[in-house]
């Protein structure tokens, strides 16, 4: 084999190895990639049943229903809503009128089945995805929560 052919052989082999590594990396990221949707995004775009994603917004007032360890509540972006079902312990800061981000998947009945629920850290914090969604919908209100959203003493 001449030097020229050997060099070409190594270059082609190196390119194949690079493409294989890139393909494996992208496949690994695809499995771990979790997208964020607002309730309006879900209405407009839809998501495949069983596909993992995050949904965020505000917990609608009067929507929290507890049945043993299972909790059902409605997440809204003040334009559309999505019903969420979660089994487990909710964060201490979870309450109606506050921002949440839930991670899980849609079931066949159109309910979002959450594997985890994240709540606001304090009265001034809102998850960035939720804030962007509310700004895009024109419903953004900057400042402290309203009296209805504040926790009971």
From Swiss-Prot:
NCBIfam families in the record: PRK13254.1-1 (NF009727), PRK13254.1-3 (NF009729), PRK13254.1-5 (NF009731)
Binding site for heme: 121, 125
Presence of keyword Iron: yes
Species, as recorded: Rhodospirillum rubrum (strain ATCC 11170 / ATH 1.1.1 / DSM 467 / LMG 4362 / NCIMB 8255 / S1)
UniProt keyword Calcium present: no
Region of interest (Disordered), residue spans: 132-153
Protein's membrane topology: Single-pass type II membrane protein
GO molecular function: heme binding; metal ion binding
TM annotation in the entry: 8-28
Record-given protein name: Cytochrome c-type biogenesis protein CcmE
One GO term (biological process): cytochrome complex assembly
Family listed: Belongs to the CcmE/CycJ family.
Biological function: Heme chaperone required for the biogenesis of c-type cytochromes. Transiently binds heme delivered by CcmC and transfers the heme to apo-cytochromes in a process facilitated by CcmF and CcmH.
Coarse class of the protein's main subcellular location: membrane
Periplasmic side: 29-153
Sorted UniProt keywords: Cell inner membrane, Cell membrane, Cytochrome c-type biogenesis, Heme, Iron, Membrane, Metal-binding, Signal-anchor, Transmembrane, Transmembrane helix
Lineage of the species this protein comes from: Bacteria, Pseudomonadati, Pseudomonadota, Alphaproteobacteria, Rhodospirillales
Source species, domain of life: Bacteria
Compartments, record wording: Cell inner membrane
Pfam families: CcmE
One Gene Ontology cellular component annotation held by this UniProt entry: plasma membrane
Cytoplasmic compartment segments: 1-7
Compositional bias ranges of the Low complexity kind: 144-153
């Amino acid at each position: 084999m001449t030097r020229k052919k050997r060099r070409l052989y190594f270059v082609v082999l190196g390119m194949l190895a690079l493409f294989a590594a890139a393909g494996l990396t992208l496949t690994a990221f695809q499995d771990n990639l979790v997208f964020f949707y607002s309730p309006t995004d879900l209405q407009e775009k839809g998501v495949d049943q069983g596909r993992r994603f995050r949904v965020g917004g505000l917990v609608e007032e009067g929507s929290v229903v507890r049945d043993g360890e299972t909790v059902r509540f409605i997440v809204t972006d003040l334009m559309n809503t999505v019903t969420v079902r979660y089994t487990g312990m909710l964060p201490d800061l979870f309450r109606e009128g506050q921002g949440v981000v839930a991670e899980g998947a849609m079931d066949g009945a159109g309910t979002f089945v959450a594997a985890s629920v994240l709540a606001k850290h304090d009265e001034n914090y809102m998850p960035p995805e939720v804030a962007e969604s509310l700004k895009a919908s024109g419903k953004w209100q900057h400042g402290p929560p309203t009296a209805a959203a504040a926790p009971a003493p």
